[in-house]
Amino acid sequence: QELPEVLADLVAAEAEGYDHVLFAATTLGKAAMPRVAALLDRAAISDIVAVKGPRTFVRGIYAGALLATVETTEDVVVATVRTTAFEGVASIEAAAPIEPVACPDANEDAQFVKFTEVQSDRPELVSAKVVVAGGRGLIDETGFKALEELADGIGAAVGATRTAVDMGLCPNDWQVGQTGKMIAPQLYMAFGISGAIQHTAGIKDAKVIVAVDKDPEAPIFEVADYGLVADGAETCRALAAKLAK
């Protein structure tokens, strides 16, 4: 199992001779990249969403509410890249070579203990084409139970806001947003989600956003392609019941 402490030591040791050291903006990448930048004594750039030149990039600021074009003068660019902001590259015959390297001495500050995989028949949240998500507006576990039934009925992954996670309504690995997972589904359906910028930062690359919330002034409607002013929990239950028939 990869640990950011060990990965950072390995990457820093192999970085000589390279002018770009890039990580995907995943949980592991976000944890390892700053460590590598510190070991190399270089300034870092986080969450790149577009490339303007070898040392000029576009990144989100203010939880993705604004985009900033930044240029670095560092001789080695150390950065994380938001993979959902880029289209996948078609397969090509000349793939980049993969070279094994020797691992440095184990980092005594961190040790891998155990990895417990969450078993689920649903699609992976970060790669799902359809995601249904719930927030505080679903109120309790029964609202999220209806959300799960809806997801299973249409073959979708399940997401949630940080508030819902903090309330104990759903597991942490469902969290979508700046401090959770960045996703780019074809369809994102939000039930009872007001639309804090920390959450909407994680769904900016969704192709179609459908929002259901009883507050007509909820910020989620500003980013939604389709909106319904209604109780998120009741709407979710009604859709789940309709699918069950």
Where is each model-derived feature located?
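N-terminal glycine-rich FAD/FM-binding segment characteristic of electron-transfer flavoproteins
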Residues: 1-245
